[in-house]
């Protein structure tokens, strides 16, 4: 998993996972895996899945031809509400893109260490075949 800055300002974690490295062979299978991880943590609430590929196609937006499918799994760690401004950085999402021979799993860094650790562990857990 690597950390990078998207557009030179958004801290993003990215994992590129070859399909030979994971037992998940579709975006839907990765979504199922992530939903299990979310359900297994009592401090996390699943919200939904946004099919970004279908949305972009429907509005006739531009899609990189290498992307075969792309979704965001949306959830919230919301352990506390110390102030109303914290709502600006919630909920969280993990993006999953099928690039043909590999998946790209990405998420923006959260302002809360336990959330980052959990999301990183979930992404790394997809590499279950070596």
Regions found by a protein language model. Name each.
Residues 32-84:
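Ser/Thr-rich, low-complexity intrinsically disordered terminal regions
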